[in-house]
């Protein structure tokens, strides 16, 4: 099985989209629309089950709903090729089913050990959990593409489930992407502090916006 490399600086490959080769500007619009569909999917899930668990089926379903209009051949399916991203090789594709299952179980176990919301360290512990979650998900790289976007949408699901507001980790500008990728690369070295800082800043901003309503 051949190895595929994602583009440098986190750019998404779009050569095999359902629309053929399209300008980056058009792809961005499709990605934004896909993310909106994904967030609506999450809202619908939580409206039926407030404590919706992170599971392989949920992850695959979210990816399919969000990106099948762009890449219908493999949206919602675990990758079946070997890929490299950000200068490193992703785990072997034939290990993905087990890795994703263990990741979901680990996530739920960590959520179950969070302190009560009235505890002083609740938000700090949530931020640490989300930083671990995002980094681990992208490291596993379950999909051929859109792993980062899927991780960020799942982060919102966890926040809403915990009674916290959604956050937006900006990634559209070059500066935003550089900050996020630097934080993720630090995580590769076992240091999640930069990613925790980005998540903490975004969560603080969301909480402040609620107070100002």
Give the ranges of each region predicted by the language model.
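FIC/Doc superfamily catalytic core
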Residues: 1-145, 149-213
């Amino acid at each position: 099985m051949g190895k595929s490399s994602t583009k440098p600086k986190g750019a998404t490959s779009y050569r095999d989209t359902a629309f053929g080769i399209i300008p980056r500007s058009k792809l961005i619009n499709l990605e934004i629309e896909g993310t909106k569909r994904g967030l609506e999917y999450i809202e619908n899930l939580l409206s039926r089950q407030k404590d919706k668990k992170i599971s392989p089926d949920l992850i695959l379903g979210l990816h399919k709903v969000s990106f099948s209009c762009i890449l219908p051949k493999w949206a919602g399916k675990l990758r079946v090729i070997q890929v490299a991203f950000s200068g490193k090789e992703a785990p072997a594709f034939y290990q993905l089913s087990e890795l994703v299952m263990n990741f979901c179980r680990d996530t739920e176990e960590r959520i179950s050990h969070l302190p009560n919301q009235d505890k002083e360290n609740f938000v700090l512990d949530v931020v640490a959990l989300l930083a671990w979650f995002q980094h681990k998900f992208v490291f596993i790289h379950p999909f051929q593409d859109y792993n980062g976007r899927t991780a960020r949408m799942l982060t919102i699901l966890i926040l809403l489930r915990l009674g916290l507001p959604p956050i937006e980790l900006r990634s559209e500008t070059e500066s935003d992407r550089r900050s996020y990728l630097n934080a993720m690369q630090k995580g590769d070295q076992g240091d999640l502090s930069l990613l925790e800082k980005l998540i903490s800043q975004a969560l603080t901003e969301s909480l402040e916006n609620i107070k100002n309503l």
